[in-house]
């Protein structure tokens, strides 16, 4: 695939990917913000913490499960993270079950349809949306799951490896929270802090995606 990319006009939705294509493969690309559609939503109750990305190696779901187990042990069952998303069975079996002895099923709420109604149902109760993605040669910018969470009033909790790029639009304790491991995540979820100002700051990230020409 890489050998043939020179024949096409390439568009990337994150600056890190654009840079990687150029420096690694000498492939030019154009960076464009991905557009966002303002679908109908219900008022956010802010009662839960959710994780909605794939359950996979680069998503670090094990950190979330470890944090949940600690929270339960400390009597904070109401603060655990509900986990949604498609499973990578290899990750679940080899990493979670065999290597780490972690039980995803204790917190797994299943998949949801990729439509606005189901998306709204999951996010309408979410005070926090946890996405611990850390992908080699990627990060710093946004993705659809981030924008959906911001749009519905859920504050993002992100992996520090995602935002370590100096050009990242995400700033810890300004428009998101940043954690490096389960201990950081536990501390944050135990506090269950007020996020009104942070939610408003995050909304500013959404605005450029509402008027994008492709």
Q: Which residues does each PLM region occupy?
A:
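A short, active-site helix/loop in glycosyltransferases that binds the activated sugar's phosphate group
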Residues: 1-29
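Short beta-strand->alpha-helix junction loop in the catalytic core
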Residues: 16-17, 26, 30-42, 55, ...
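Conserved donor-binding/catalytic core segment of Leloir-type glycosyltransferases
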Residues: 40-69, 82
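Glycosyltransferase donor-sugar binding loop
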Residues: 77-96
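Nucleotide-activated donor-binding/catalytic signature segment of Leloir-type glycosyltransferases, i.e.
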Residues: 93-120
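Acidic donor-binding loop of glycosyltransferase active sites
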Residues: 121-139, 154
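Nucleotide-sugar-dependent
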Residues: 131-147, 159-168
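A charged, aromatic-enriched C-terminal amphipathic alpha-helix characteristic of glycosyltransferases
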Residues: 180, 189, 193-214
């Amino acid at each position: 695939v890489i050998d043939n990319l020179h024949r096409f006009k390439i568009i990337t939705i994150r600056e890190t990917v654009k840079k990687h294509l150029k420096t690694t493969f000498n492939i030019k690309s154009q960076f464009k913000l991905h557009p966002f559609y303002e679908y109908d939503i219900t008022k956010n109750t802010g009662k839960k913490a959710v994780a909605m990305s794939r359950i996979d190696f680069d998503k670090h779901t094990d950190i979330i499960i470890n944090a949940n187990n600690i929270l339960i042990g400390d009597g904070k069952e109401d603060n655990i993270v509900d986990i949604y998303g498609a499973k990578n069975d290899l990750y679940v079996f080899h990493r979670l079950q065999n290597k780490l002895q972690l039980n995803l099923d204790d917190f797994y709420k299943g998949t949801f349809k990729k439509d606005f109604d189901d998306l709204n149902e999951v996010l309408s109760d979410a005070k926090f949306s946890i996405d611990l993605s850390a992908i080699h040669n990627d990060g710093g910018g946004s993705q659809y799951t981030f924008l959906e969470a911001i749009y519905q009033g859920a504050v993002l909790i992100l992996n520090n490896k995602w935002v370590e790029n100096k050009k990242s639009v995400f700033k810890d304790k300004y428009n998101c929270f940043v954690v490096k491991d389960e201990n950081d995540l536990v501390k944050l979820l135990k506090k269950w802090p007020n996020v009104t100002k942070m939610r408003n700051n995050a909304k500013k990230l959404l605005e450029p995606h509402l008027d994008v020409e492709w």
